[in-house]
């Protein structure tokens, strides 16, 4: 059985939990989700989802609780959406705590503020997908080790490096389990 942790601090936590459980069921995988807020919470998790919110606040929480060091040391798979993508990157246009697990540079709020949020049909990993962008960042630079999963308007909006997946938009706000299934497969491949 696998356990997917969902950081229970900000963002669409419940929505991530619902769509992850839906994806597990569709894939017929014995798994569960668990809300995570402390180091003790994450110890039995095989993967972690970091959702949207204020990335600097989430980053400070990860450092204060010891979760940041734990995530770097253990290498458990992480799906980061919106603010989670920012946290996974090595660099951003703001001075803030980062996990630095994806060799990328991210522009926070790259597509604009709240009033400039939008939805668009995109290709994700060569599949049709409905992207929901809310104060979305984009990736301005990547190393050769980073795989591009999606672009919008020539801007990189989804990447994967090793067991880390970063998404600029909000897959938890759709009914489409494509991205969560990709993450679950990554978690499964890392479980010994």
UniProtKB/Swiss-Prot annotation:
PROSITE patterns (alphabetical): PDXT_SNO_2
Gene3D superfamilies (UniProt xref): 3.40.50.880
Known pathway: Cofactor biosynthesis; pyridoxal 5'-phosphate biosynthesis
GO biological process, one term: pyridoxal phosphate biosynthetic process
EC numbers: 4.3.3.6, 3.5.1.2
Protein keywords: Glutamine amidotransferase, Hydrolase, Lyase, Pyridoxal phosphate
Assigned GO CC terms: cytosol; glutaminase complex
GO terms, molecular function: glutaminase activity; pyridoxal 5'-phosphate synthase (glutamine hydrolysing) activity
Job description of the protein: Catalyzes the hydrolysis of glutamine to glutamate and ammonia as part of the biosynthesis of pyridoxal 5'-phosphate. The resulting ammonia molecule is channeled to the active site of PdxS.
Record-stated family: Belongs to the glutaminase PdxT/SNO family.
Protein name per UniProt: Pyridoxal 5'-phosphate synthase subunit PdxT
Gene symbol of the encoding locus: pdxT
